[in-house]
Amino acid sequence: MAEGLAAEDESYRILRSRIDLSRLPPLCRTVTEHVIAASADFDYATDLLCDEQVLAAASAELAAGAAVVTDSAMVAAGINGYPVICKSEDALTARLARTAGISLPAAAVRLAFGQAGPGAIWVVGSEPAALGEIMARNVQPSLVIGLPAGLAGAAEAKDAVRASGLPALTNVSEKGGAAVAAAAFCALATAALASGELDATTLNSR
């Protein structure tokens, strides 16, 4: 445990020695640092599109108990200490994907819609089509973390989310992935804990 924390501290020390993100507002800076640390990709310093007010509102919703939905088990595995709704490995999800001719992450999002309710935080890192499902379902999210990777449709899907007017954290390019999406969420949760908005005791009881 101590070795892991030391390695993490060293990672952030190296990051801050190589790039100055002080121009960014606090939440955007925290998210950007987490994403760069998780990916070792400094391009995210300019590739991520963050809105401080959107992140602040989502942080408040998180503290109030907002549901968190992921499009895949890989994204869910990267979110430690916060309960998530993830339907990607349910038998019903596989059946829906086959009958509807859609991907498993898209089917997982479709099935999670009824359980999550309005105000949820949707974390998508595996499949661009999952973002299409979110837009089609009128989910009324507090935040869509839309960071799937892919050469076929990922950048376009993220652009569509931004154009939709949904509160979103996305990036411009085709890059992304489960680890990046999970890191962005964990950054938000970490910031909420540090500010006192999110109480660790309450978090562990959820």
Locations of regions flagged by a protein language model:
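C-terminal functional extensions of proteins
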Residues: 152-206
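Glycine-rich, small/polar surface segments that engage phosphate groups of diverse ligands
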Residues: 61, 67-108
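Electropositive, gly/pro-rich neighborhoods at or near active sites that engage anionic ligands
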Residues: 1-69, 78
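Glycine-rich oxoanion-binding loops at beta->alpha junctions
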Residues: 89-132, 176
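Short, basic, glycine/proline-bearing loop/turn elements
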Residues: 38-46, 94-97, 119-120, 143
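ADP-ribose/adenylate-binding Rossmann-like module
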Residues: 143-152
